């Protein structure tokens, strides 16, 4: 936080500064006008470019929307065909009843699965019980009295 100390200019320095600003003044005004003109030209060019980009994007977007609408119309037509043929497909499915042969096959598979489950259960249950050792215990077991 330094404190700025104002230094007073001597009359000679003030005169030099005033003459310098007076001599440069008209040049600055012209440069400002030129920059204003160039700036307006640049702004106009930017605005035109932005408008062209926007029109290009909107055109591309319109083409993409049209393609999406066409695809959607095709999908909707296909879905309508499927829905229109649905009653006939259901009728065909009803007429093709499963034969009793298939029923016996499914019953046999179910019985085999149940038998396999019973065998697996008995094996697991047997393995959870420890088998008694054929050897006598190494330590004499005496009841406490």
UniProtKB/Swiss-Prot annotation:
Protein name per its UniProtKB record: Cell wall synthesis protein CwsA
Membrane association type: Single-pass membrane protein
Location(s), subcellular: Cell membrane
Domain of life: Bacteria
Any one GO BP annotation for this protein: cell division
Organism: Mycobacterium tuberculosis (strain ATCC 25618 / H37Rv)
Listed transmembrane segments: 104-124
Pfam families from the UniProt entry: CwsA
Coiled-coil ranges (or none): none
Keywords: Cell cycle, Cell division, Cell membrane, Cell shape, Membrane, Transmembrane, Transmembrane helix
Function: Required for regulated cell division, cell wall synthesis and the maintenance of cell shape.
Gene: cwsA
InterPro entries: CwsA (IPR024245)
Family: Belongs to the CwsA family.
One GO term describing the cellular component: plasma membrane
């Amino acid at each position: 936080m330094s404190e700025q100390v104002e230094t007073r200019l001597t009359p000679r320095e003030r005169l030099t500064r005033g003459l310098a600003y007076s001599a440069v003044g008209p040049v600055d005004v012209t440069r400002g006008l030129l920059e204003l003109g160039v700036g307006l030209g640049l702004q106009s060019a930017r605005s035109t470019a932005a408008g062209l980009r926007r029109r290009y994007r909107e055109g591309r977007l319109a083409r993409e929307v049209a393609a999406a609408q066409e695809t959607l119309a095709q999908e909707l037509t296909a879905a309508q065909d499927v829905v229109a043929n649905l009653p006939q497909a259901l009728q065909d499915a009803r007429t093709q009843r499963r034969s009793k042969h298939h029923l016996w096959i499914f019953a046999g598979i179910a019985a085999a699965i149940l038998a396999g489950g019973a065998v697996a259960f008995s094996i697991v249950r047997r393995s959870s019980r420890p088998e008694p050792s054929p050897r006598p215990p190494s330590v004499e077991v005496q009841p406490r009295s």
